[in-house]
């Protein structure tokens, strides 16, 4: 089993243990358990994957817009399992000729001619828990945490040539990495009818390890529409 997959499985096991303990604590106090719900939303993502290239003459565009879909299954009035998918996104950095430095830890890079490096993150999948304390009004707060599973390609394009970690690349993918990292989030929701709400939240990853020097470092603000079945 690849090291990255082994680490991912260990994280998943740890998360499931935490979820089990939380469920055991709250399920005993459950009264009327809400119906399952689904959420559709959009996020403004900030991805710091290319921030290590910052320097003179370098232009970095580290924002993109994604969409997401999640399903929540309640095990108590306040606690639910959450699973979903986030659409892919990409960010880019334009580098001048003769730029050089270290990136992804101790890996060296240099450019011959101007070029653009783009990271393309495929659809990411998440699994976690969401906690929303009971309230008497329409406005409520919630927190969530879990694991995000991701897959990212680093691509060089343009007339220049990139030398990365001792190898030379031109107009091609030079690095592919996949893994998983914890995420945490806080949000506000407003109930507009018995089974429908709007929500606004902030989510960020909490990278615990780097795979081939790459650590997922995302954050984003989201607006969404929630509907209970």
What do the PLM-derived regions correspond to, one by one?
Residues 1-35:
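Cleavable N-terminal export/targeting peptides
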Residues 27-74, 81, 149:
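Short glycine/proline- and aromatic-enriched beta-strand/turn motifs that initiate or cap beta-hairpins
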Residues 28-29, 68, 75-77, 129-135, ...:
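Outer-membrane beta-barrel proteins
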Residues 37-39, 190, 217-229:
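Outer-membrane beta-barrel "beta-signal"
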Residues 38, 78-83, 137-141, 190, ...:
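Repeated loop/turn-to-beta-strand initiation elements of outer-membrane beta-barrel proteins
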Residues 39, 68-72, 126-128, 183-185, ...:
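Membrane-embedded beta-strand positions in outer-membrane beta-barrel channels/transporters
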Residues 44, 73, 85, 131-133, ...:
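Residue-level signature of outer-membrane beta-barrel architecture
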Residues 46-64, 86-124, 150-179, 204-218:
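Extracellular/periplasm-exposed beta-strand and loop segments of Gram-negative cell-envelope proteins
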